[in-house]
Amino acid sequence: DMNDVVIYYSSTVVKDKSSNALVRTTTTFTPMNDGATYTNGFGFQLDYVGKEHIDLVQVSQEGNVIGKNFEPGIEKPVLILFSDIKPVLKKPVTVVIGFKKYDKVSDMDAYPPYNSFIFVNKRSHEVHLSGYKPTSVADESLRGTGSDLSQDSNGTPMYYIAEDNMPFAINISNSEFRWPSEKVSITTYYPEFKQWRDSFGADYKDWYLHPKE
């Protein structure tokens, strides 16, 4: 039904005028729905920017700074924003990340939505946006279990896609997205979703603007 976790986000990107290098990103994440009975946390990883390129990390909520550090013990920068989404529904969290002036970080390397993911009951049980790799602390033994498609017919690794090409998680550019009710299939609520899915995103790219009335 694609409603277990719904998070809205908006981002502001600041670039250096002379070099066009990325200076700072400010992103606000707002959990809007948690339709699952289990506990869902949320975080994101910067896949292409090392910690050595970052000189500022600040997480704030309601004007109060609640965090300044990446998750320890992981080589890549990972921020965990919520360990349980239910208590923080509709409570925005703002993340500011500053980049070192002379490192010339590309905005394509550090542009939202990042490698966002939820984790279900356990930190190691990650669910990422389809096509994104898990973090180094994810339980790799879960790959290929249940309906998970761990590789295509040519042996190419696949990430967070089911055997029927159903994505485990999606990112869309619509702040007015209407998610289906519990136990209502997204293919029923959004009739064009199936064609979009079956075409691997080539057709019906605005499916999310056309819910069933």
Regions found by a protein language model. Give the residues of each.
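Extracellular distal adhesion/interaction modules in secreted or cell-surface proteins
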Residues: 1-213
